[in-house]
Amino acid sequence: ESDRNRLCMYNLATGEKTYLTESFDSNVDDFCWSDTKDAMIYFIGVWHATENLYAITKKGEVKQLTDYCADFGSLQMLGDHKHILAERHSYGEPADLYVITPGKDIAKTAIVQITAENKHITDQLAKIQVEKRWVKTDDGKDMLYWVVLPPHFDANKKYPTLLFCEGGPQSPVSQFWSYRWNFMIMASQGYVVVAPNRRGLPGFGSEWNEQISGDWTGQCMRDYLTAIDDAAANLPYVDKDRLGCVGASFGGFSVYYLAGHHDKRFKAFIAHDGAFNLESMYTDTEEAWFSNWEYEDAYWNKDLSANAKRTYENSPHKFVDK
């Protein structure tokens, strides 16, 4: 739940720290080091809702080496220091292992799949379709959201549609494969899934990511409504009379909040382990630093801070009658 994960080199002899990924304005999620004359460091970074492989050169330049509509992770440099073992997954594919031979750029990087652990199952399943869509937010920013389409999709039909609310709150809506909130399962039940990269997510620059801190019920909630309104108005297969809202953790909080502020957009809500009462959460959590950072103060001091006052006054439990 850090605002930004950076890669830092620490000199044990001098105590000097050198931050290596300052030019990459997003999160570093995993890394490995090639013990060769080039001494390359490779890392997984999230950008525009996918997690791909990057390299840091001797000159401190960050270069992207893969560009898949998928997420890579769990990097391990192999013994020859010329190949990297990694796992890759997406909304339609559970994780498998790949061997990556890094090149100087995307075109010269080779990838070979070496496992297919679930092929005997996935071969029996109809495939989903996944599309990217960009929309202007109410404050004039460009926002990306994923559209997940059901198997055997027919553009001439109308489909019930789910707005997916991400947790974190600063976790990317990338091409994750989840065994809990699985978009393939949702779509296979006949739903279109709309998954916005709303304010407060990495992969779109620090300003976009950090905006949510202290503003849990402001711009990020308007971003959610922008996405579902765009889908309902401009995607003819979305049934605007059958919209649902789902999410876990901060996504669950978002569902609770939107249930009191959706202006009759949604017919159903599903929340998993979301914060419902922020006053109760403040006194219950062991992660006191997080609450103090996000809420700015305890609820009994809410009148001492404009941000704290706004936060507690917008706790979802205060809108159960809406």
Q: Which residues make up each language-model segment?
A:
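Active-site-proximal cap/loop segments of hydrolase catalytic domains
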Residues: 182, 187-188, 195-322
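Alpha/beta-hydrolase fold active-site loops
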Residues: 143, 160, 242
